[in-house]
Amino acid sequence: MFITYGRGGFVIKSNKDKSVARASAESEIHSMSNATSRGAYELDFGKSQQHLKENDQCHLYEDNQAVIHMANNGRSYSDKTRHIKIHHYFVKQHLDNGEFTLSHCPTQEMIADILTKPIQGSQFIKLRNRLLGYEEVFPNLVWGVWK
């Protein structure tokens, strides 16, 4: 997870999942749920310290299209996703009440991947520069969470 405020990151975290997932989408939605929880805390803290405005939103970036679909539409009742627990509506709840927005981020642009995958060459340099704030990720973005 990588949380930005302005140009640079202020929360950078990488850890091994504590649960075993049957599918990659389940693992991704677990991670998104954790990132949403941390993002909600940081958003509330920023507002309480008056560093953020009351109408500021947190932007979630995800590279898995299936997870984006599940988060936007709630739990899917297909055979492949019926085992995902209902508590993952947590993400949808934050999206629905407007605190968070969710966008697709191509795998090549996913900053959090530098923490978990063996990236080399120019891709590593590009993601490292964004992670350290040397290069703007999105010029108009104030607050973002890469999961």
Segments (PLM) and residue ranges:
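RNase H-like nuclease module associated with reverse transcription
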Residues: 18-147
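RNase H-like nuclease fold core
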Residues: 1-25
